[in-house]
Amino acid sequence: MSKLNAYFGEYGGQFVPQILVPALDQLEHEFIKAQADESFKQEFKELLQEYAGRPTALTKTRNIVKNTKTKLYLKREDLLHGGAHKTNQVLGQALLAKRMGKKEIIAETGAGQHGVATALACALLDLKCRVYMGAKDVERQSPNVFRMKLMGAEVIPVHSGSATLKDACNEALRDWSANYNKAHYLLGTAAGPHPFPTIVREFQRMIGEETKQQILAKEGKLPDAVIACVGGGSNAIGMFADFIDETSVQLIGVEPAGKGIETGEHGAPLKHGKTGIFFGMKAPLMQNSDGQIEESYSISAGLDFPSVGPQHAHLLAIGRAEYASATDNEALDAFKLLCKKEGIIPALESSHALAYALKLAYENPDKEQLLVVNLSGRGDKDIFTVHDILKEKGEM
């Protein structure tokens, strides 16, 4: 059986303890078999349609870019069951786990969206579920913690390190090392050791496939650019995958600039990091001069990650995609605008992509351009965070 390529240019690979290599080999083997199995593909497709609610809408905005010549569409992953794009690939991986005879699922989560998606898939497919979550994130994402528990998941707060996503990732890998015979590690983004970046991309690529069909039906042409936020990079690679060969379409990823790149408090390793080994892969990393992992920071827990998926690093290196950044304040402004102008409450993660799209529209009001933003999730989970910030600013 042919194997998948473990690298994207110089990025990717499989830097894990020897004990995990058989588990990763088994995962790759089963994934390749599943991709050629019509019954697996049919079951996945049915779950996406009947349970998750695909295809999701492509919504043309009415008011937010009204005084410009930009046409702005939103790919509505916020309407997916579970509230974000995460549900897509989680259903795929959970089906794979069942196929491998695994009865338990281990996951990590930042904003809690991946945890919620994993919990709902495990409830549906009768799998035992435990989710590692940084203690800080447990505090700032209490609604999602409760959702996970309601669906039968065990949520394990991680107090080590910065008590955020990277520490939850480390604990999840530790657990998997001890239990890989009976448990599948359901990784939440298009990063980590091979074959995860490829598996997650393939289980998210319907985002871009649907977008392409929908925009051609609505506008009769491809967009000038597709724009998505980038933390680990799964919603972005899901949007980009089907457009990579369409060279007329700009691929724009938006990293979190946090309090400003110059402050060091950000999560933008693609443009402002150095290549290193982290989380089982070779990828751009936020690290200090000693090579220690630096703390990443973002207003949105889901983008608060010090590295990024290897395919994004490769797309940047070969010049196929470009990567910008948006600050906390820019994301907040975009969040508020979408609420007030379109009646849609976006996730703070997705608000970073929206902020950059609005910048393109407002800075060139006379430029005719067709833009699509991947609205990767809804903002219910963020309303308390936003409320507290606006109250502090005297805007409430």
UniProtKB/Swiss-Prot annotation:
Disulfide bonds: none annotated. Pathway: Amino-acid biosynthesis; L-tryptophan biosynthesis; L-tryptophan from chorismate: step 5/5. SUPFAM superfamilies: Tryptophan synthase beta subunit-like PLP-dependent enzymes. One of its GO terms (molecular function) is tryptophan synthase activity. NCBIfam families: trpB (TIGR00263). Its cofactor is pyridoxal 5'-phosphate. The beta subunit is responsible for the synthesis of L-tryptophan from indole and L-serine. Pfam families: PALP (PF00291). It is an enzyme of class 4 (lyase). One of its GO terms (cellular component) is cytoplasm. It comes from the Bacteria. CDD domains: Trp-synth_B. Tetramer of two alpha and two beta chains. It comes from Francisella philomiragia subsp. philomiragia (strain ATCC 25017 / CCUG 19701 / FSC 153 / O#319-036). Belongs to the TrpB family. This is Tryptophan synthase beta chain. PROSITE patterns: TRP_SYNTHASE_BETA (PS00168). The lineage of its organism: Bacteria, Pseudomonadati, Pseudomonadota, Gammaproteobacteria, Thiotrichales. Its EC number is 4.2.1.20. The modification N6-(pyridoxal phosphate)lysine is found at K86. Keywords: Amino-acid biosynthesis, Aromatic amino acid biosynthesis, Lyase, Pyridoxal phosphate, Tryptophan biosynthesis. It catalyses: (1S,2R)-1-C-(indol-3-yl)glycerol 3-phosphate + L-serine = D-glyceraldehyde 3-phosphate + L-tryptophan + H2O.
